[in-house]
Regions:
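C-terminal/peripheral segments of proteins
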Residues: 1-203, 211, 215-419
């Protein structure tokens, strides 16, 4: 097994050079020169200009189609459907080694010219999906398949919501003041816990599942709760867990579920609608969801903060958001079943971890952050749960940046080290 990043010794230098960059142009040039980011997408803005940069430029194995055709092993062919972007080549033949481009920074890696990037004057973004829609108005295509799909598959619900949020912000139609991405507005947007599956499918789903003459009293009550729900996962939202349990149980193939299939020319609005023929399957999923909630001991209209929480140091912190698969933009996704005490975020969850919103006022930097899981895993530490509780209260921490801000911090102290 060969790891392209096992031969990548440039990543720390890349980060150091980025920290010293004086402009967005310099930042972009550094990324192209180093091509060292091991696995993540990059988004960046600079000071004094309406420009935003997206790149999936890093250390990526160079396995073009002809190499895959000639060198993929029988095991690789058998696994291709499950792992389409993982090349499994015959390592016993030198002809099957990864290729090197003229502009490859590292032997065996894809050259910079064949890696996705985009510079825009409106916005860029990535919500853990492929590079294809870094901007909904400017799809990226023509890059090696190892970078992911490009227009051949529906985008995740969270990706669709993220782009929708950006476009609504620029249009000034999202309910926040103006149409600019100010720090204050962005800090509210990313925590507002919108649920895209509910925004797009709740009404037609309820029209199908709540009209059965044989609906139980519990189903009728759940329908009433969801009709009144505001399609958000805030701590006070009532009934969101019923929707989560329902939507996660919908296992109908896309061709039988959606009224309008995915269209790469309209990726944010497709697939959409629900087919009447899916009603029976949806009713079964809804009934099972209602039963699961009732068996859990949580009320159908329980506030989300009662169901989704973190319990540290004897204090329970109500949380918000949910899972990407359900279409939450704000991710706090518990792996704990609702029937085992609720959606606890204290086991092996996934979701928001380190968050930052940064703007560049004249002559300075303003950064607001969260470390959602807190700084320490020691229950005796004062920092075992403080950041988590602040996150639950949506109280961003303004971090000091300038020297005067650092020395003015109440926790500032100096330590002199000598040999």
């Amino acid at each position: 097994m060969r790891d392209i990043n096992g031969e990548n010794f440039r990543s720390l230098r890349n980060w150091l050079r980025w920290n010293q960059a004086k402009s967005l142009d310099e930042f972009m040039q550094i990324q192209k020169e180093e091509a060292a980011i091991p696995w993540v997408n990059t988004v960046a803005v600079g000071r004094g200009a309406a420009r935003a940069w997206y790149a999936d430029i890093g250390t990526v194995p160079n396995a073009p189609p002809d190499l895959l055709a000639a060198c993929t092993t029988p095991v690789g062919k058998a696994m291709a459907a499950a792992l389409p972007e993982v090349p499994i080549l015959d390592g016993a033949r030198s002809a099957c080694h990864w290729r090197t481009d003229a502009d490859s920074v590292q032997k065996g890696a894809i050259g910079v010219a064949r890696m996705p990037s985009l510079l825009r004057d409106d916005y860029v973004g990535n919500m853990n999906d492929s590079y294809w829609l870094a901007n909904a108005s400017a799809p990226l295509t023509g890059f090696p398949s190892i970078f992911g799909t490009a227009g051949t598959a529906a985008q995740s619900l969270r990706t669709r919501l993220g782009h929708t949020m950006a476009l609504e912000r620029l249009a000034g139609t999202d309910g926040y003041p103006g149409n600019k991405a100010t720090s204050e507005v962005v800090r509210q947007m990313v925590l507002n816990s919108r649920v895209f599956s509910a925004e797009r499918f709740k009404d037609p789903a309820l029209d199908l599942v709540c009209t059965a003459p044989s609906a139980s009293q519990d189903v009728v009550a759940a329908c009433a709760t969801l009709r009144a729900w505001d399609n958000r996962g805030s701590t006070s939202a009532r009934g969101s867990h019923v929707w989560d349990e329902f939507w996660s149980r919908v296992q109908v193939p896309a061709a039988q579920l959606y009224a309008v299939p995915f269209d790469p020319a309209d990726p944010l609005n497709t697939p959409r609608g629900l087919q009447p023929g899916a009603a029976d399957a949806l009713r079964q999923a809804f009934g099972a969801a209602v039963q699961a909630v009732k068996a859990s001991g949580f009320a159908l209209d329980a506030p989300r903060g009662d169901v989704l929480f973190s319990a540290r140091g004897g204090v329970r912190t109500a949380l918000y958001g949910g899972c990407s698969a359900v279409g939450y933009f704000t991710i706090n996704c518990s792996e704990n079943p609702i029937g085992q005490g609720g959606y606890s975020m204290d086991g092996q969850p996934h979701g928001n971890s380190y968050m930052q919103v940064v703007n560049f006022p004249a002559g300075g930097v303003q950064a607001y952050t969260f470390l959602t899981f807190s700084l320490s895993d020691d229950p005796g530490s004062a920092h075992y749960a403080d950041y988590t509780r602040a996150y639950g209260a949506q109280q961003w921490l303004r971090v000091p940046f300038a020297e005067a801000e650092i020395t003015a911090d109440k926790n500032y102290q100096t330590v002199t080290v000598s040999e």
